[in-house]
Structure formats: C-alpha cells, structure tokens
Amino acid sequence: MLDWSRCDAVERVPDRLSGAWTFKGTRVPVMALFQNLEGGATVDLFLEWFPGVTRQQVDAVLDHTTRSLTEA
C-alpha cells in the first residue's frame, strides 16, 4: 500500500468519496488515473476527461508511485 500522505498532489477528506484519496481540490479519485491508464487511456485523455486535474498533479502522483515502488 502506498503512503499517499507524502504526496502533495492528493488529499483525503473523510466526508468526501468515503475517504478515498483524491486529486487535491477535486472529487476525482487517484484510483481513476490508474484505472484509466490500465484501460488504455493516455494521460492527455485522462486530463481531458477530468479537467479539474492538472498535469502537474498527475506527474506528481506518477512520480510518487515510482519512488514508492523503487524504495520497497
């Protein structure tokens, strides 16, 4: 399990989306990024589909994931 509390691009609000991690300032779950990428979408398509999310946030989430996996 990744420690999302160390990623500045995301937040967890207990009363929002059952406490799921979301992109900061949005209601878009972080998991939506990975589900869309797994389904064949590109980052550009994801950003088009979820305009409240910025490229910087996506880059930060992907960087955090990569760092977390290489540290494990």
Language-model features: where?
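Long, charge-rich, low-complexity alpha-helical segments
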Residues: 26-72
